[in-house]
């Protein structure tokens, strides 16, 4: 009986998170309020707070989903690809693809949806970006060990550039109302970024 109830609670939490992400996909939605969310779900605001202690906790749930999705793909890339340079390429491409497929979550990634929210949410996004940068730095070091990059290559600066590129593409995607495809010029831009 308790397992069935826990599953139902989990389903309701997931539905709330999915609804927030869907609402964020609408460029006209400036801010998701609990009142708007409750109206969309056809429940009371009190019903939302039975599942999440605060709105910040709802966004934390979205960030956890983003982390899980991004890093599971990165782990698959690292396991499947031996070339450090190809790992870096695939990781950045996967970040752009994630934005393409998850428009609402991209607004969370660029901080657009977090304006006027708890500052710890932006700190979580910053930590996520730092982890991605560390992963890219490691892939670039592997590329150097394989002879694809010079030993004196500045791995930190290169990894930072790749993260800045991805964040910039996400930003353009969001600010264009999801019209400027993050992967539009990827095949032409990667050779420049790889150097």
Stretches with model-predicted labels:
Residues 1-27, 31-40, 57:
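Basic, helix-initiating cap at the start of DNA-binding domains
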Residues 1, 90, 94-101, 134-146, ...:
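C-terminal peripheral helix-coil segments that are non-catalytic and often amphipathic
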Residues 99-120:
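Amphipathic alpha-helical segments used for helix-helix packing
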Residues 42-52:
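Short hydrophobic/aromatic patch on the recognition helix
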Residues 61, 75-103, 155-162:
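Hydrophobic alpha-helical connector segments
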Residues 5, 24-27, 33-34, 45, ...:
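Amphipathic alpha-helical segments enriched in hydrophobic/aromatic and basic residues
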Residues 68-71, 75, 119-146, 156-160:
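Amphipathic alpha-helical packing segments from all-alpha helical-bundle domains
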